[in-house]
Amino acid sequence: EKLFRQFCQAGITSYQITLDGWNHDKTRPHVSGKGTLRTIIDNLVALSKLPPEEYSFHITLRRNLLAGDEDYSWYDYLYRLFGQDKRFDVLVCAVGDWGGKGSHDLSPLHQDTQEVLVAKHIAYLDKIGMLRYNQMYCVSRPNRLVFWPDGKIGKCTAALNRPQPQLE
């Protein structure tokens, strides 16, 4: 929380955090093999308690969808935690196979089912009243960067299918 306050004071106020729903601990384990979801959620809850009039930030909670992912209870959980805080919204994205280590363990959505499943999840967000990210690709924004777990810095995740998404 202390570091986050420093970021806010420095003008760094917009974040995208990927949470893979209830499967998060499987899809994004800590290097130790332990789960990371509880720590991330606890940190986000702490940030949501910062006074909005003093801390004007924006956090997009990105939900990656795998094949067959139709459990909407994750959104109910997020709504209970952050649904009344306008500083939080949700972005729903289909998982693609971008190659690399661990990609063979994923169940990416087939092209013909991606749009349908994403639309179902977006409709559920609308039904419960959870704010959602406007789905505009951040590639067009010059200051959107990705900090990868291996320490590399890249351009927005929407540019992954383009050559050279890593910054030198």
Q: Would you name each region that the model predicts?
A:
Residues 25-154, 158-167:
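Radical SAM enzyme [4Fe-4S]-AdoMet core and its adjacent flexible, acidic
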Residues 4-23, 87-95:
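Non-cysteine beta-strand/loop elements that form the S-adenosyl-L-methionine
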